[in-house]
């Protein structure tokens, strides 16, 4: 009897490492050429921060190859159901009573944050738990937990929560009627997301460089243009580290007096992500980074293509990372790293095999690489 030979990585996943390797070389070259950031600690820490997410994703795929992922998924999903029920109960109470679980008032209602320091952390936690339940969904009662999750997300009144809820219904329809999710569907979703948050986008953009977020987007393009084609280098722009080790860039482009971008208060420097990419690594680095992200999309599609529930959960997490990246440095923070690990490990069976023969371990969720590569 021929047994399975577990294969750790697809060729597309190996390409992720190559894209990011070249990306890091670009960062090193621009750092050496322009010598903008004088603090070596900032350079080393920034390099580590940006390489974390592909390293954790690839390592999680490899190291979890021998785990029983179905059992792991069920275990995590059972706990998630309990947490969602508790959080939902308090979300309803928070509507009618002041119980110290809100951060501010939006649309005339309290913005729910539960026990988190900010509602954005509640949003990311709910997204992860909701996706785990979607992947594990085997009872009609699970629909209740999904609905509760959606209500909780809406009650945070965060724009990214609204767009994620839209993504859930949009991608669910795509899988139902088209049987698959393509990259172009994600772009269509992005257009809908822009329409939903258009008023907020216009409001923020109207401030120009006198407000932190639009200033980062605008100056990021100027930085990429002036340091073509490789950008300004590690530790120079649009990251918490560039504030902690205050980068000369903010003085060079006259935004060092903008609230949230000053030497004494630089909390808003990580309120975006993409200016960090094209500002520090230039247009070449931006293309390489996008190529790595597209490769992760293909990786997810190939690993979960046999199971719609798992695929939906994985693509929702992928979509959330893209949504959140417009307003936070999710690719470099703990939340983003954890989401990549969840996609690789906690959404059920996604291992790949090079043989399909009589073996008792084979089931309908095992991926036959001959059918998709």
What do these predicted regions represent?
Residues 15-31, 38-65:
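Aromatic-anchored transmembrane helix interface
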Residues 181-183, 280-322, 355, 359:
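Hydrophobic transmembrane alpha-helices and their immediate junctions
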Residues 315-373:
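Transmembrane alpha-helices of multi-pass inner-membrane enzymes
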Residues 74-102, 117-175:
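Alpha-helical transmembrane segments of multi-pass inner-membrane proteins
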Residues 204-211, 215-218, 233-281:
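Long extracytoplasmic/lumenal interhelical loops at the membrane interface
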Residues 95-98, 155-156, 173-210, 222:
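A membrane-periplasm/extracellular boundary helix in multi-pass inner-membrane enzymes
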Residues 1-29, 350-373:
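Transmembrane signal-anchor hairpin modules in multi-pass inner-membrane enzymes, especially those
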Residues 3-17, 135-144, 179-182, 297-315:
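Membrane-interface helix-loop-helix junctions at transmembrane boundaries of multi-pass membrane enzymes
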